């Protein structure tokens, strides 16, 4: 793809794009299995794009095998982030709950709120970092499996090779997440 706009146009070149996207959207509603199949479908779509094909892959459950590897990689990243945030969040909750009885210690309350704010900041920045690294993680996992996807040093090296492309892809993913969240909140036509 020479231009970013091609990324948005390519799926629409398939005459059956609407039915495929709707069916995959319905599959994605299934907890865990839908996400695994959706990740596999995305990897097959990337393969077709690289091969120069103009059609999206068929929408079905044939992609669970490819998707499970990528799902495991992202699960490890997000669980690691959750553990780091919990390491800060749990002491904050304990400190603040102790101060809820009677007269509180101002220093412990300050420490509790500081840890709480730090836990939120770590979680937010971590999620943004994972979103920005998603294209690199996907490509590394697709090429080398779980070990390559979890090789944080390799992922960061690849992200720094083309920082502009990584930044653009990350911003596109954030925009896609934002647009995806608008769907459930859009008012229904009557």
Task: Describe every region a protein language model picked out.
Residues 28-50, 82, 108-149, 170, ...:
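Selective recognition of hydrophobic, aromatic-rich stretches within alpha-helical transmembrane segments
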Residues 1-26, 37-76, 138-172:
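Membrane-interface extramembranous regions at the lipid-water interface
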Residues 75-87, 91:
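Ordered, amphipathic secondary-structure segments that act as subunit-interaction surfaces
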Residues 14, 18, 64, 104-120:
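Membrane-interface segments at the starts/ends of alpha-helical transmembrane spans
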Residues 66, 73-74, 78, 120, ...:
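Membrane-embedded alpha-helical bundles that form the substrate/pore pathway
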Residues 1-10, 100-102, 113-121, 167:
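Phosphate-binding glycine-rich loops and adjacent basic patches that engage nucleotide phosphates
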Residues 88-107, 182-190:
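Hydrophobic alpha-helical transmembrane segments and immediately flanking/interface helices
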């Amino acid at each position: 793809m020479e231009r970013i706009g091609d990324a948005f146009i390519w799926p629409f070149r398939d005459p059956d794009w609407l039915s495929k996207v709707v069916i995959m959207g319905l599959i994605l509603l299934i907890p865990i299995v839908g996400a695994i199949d959706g990740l596999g479908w995305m990897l097959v779509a990337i393969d077709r794009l690289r091969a120069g094909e103009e059609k999206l892959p068929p929408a079905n459950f044939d992609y669970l095998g490819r998707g499970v590897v990528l799902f495991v990689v992202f699960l490890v990243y997000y669980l690691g982030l959750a553990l780091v945030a919990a390491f800060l969040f749990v002491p904050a909750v304990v400190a603040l709950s102790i101060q809820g009885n009677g007269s509180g210690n101002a220093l412990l309350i300050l420490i509790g709120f500081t840890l709480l704010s730090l836990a939120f900041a770590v979680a937010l920045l971590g999620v943004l970092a994972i979103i920005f690294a998603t294209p690199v993680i996907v490509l590394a996992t697709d090429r080398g499996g779980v070990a390559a996807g979890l090789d944080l040093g390799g992922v960061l090296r690849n992200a720094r090779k083309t920082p502009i492309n990584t930044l653009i892809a990350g911003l596109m993913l954030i925009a896609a997440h934002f647009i995806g969240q608008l769907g459930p909140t859009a008012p229904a036509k009557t």
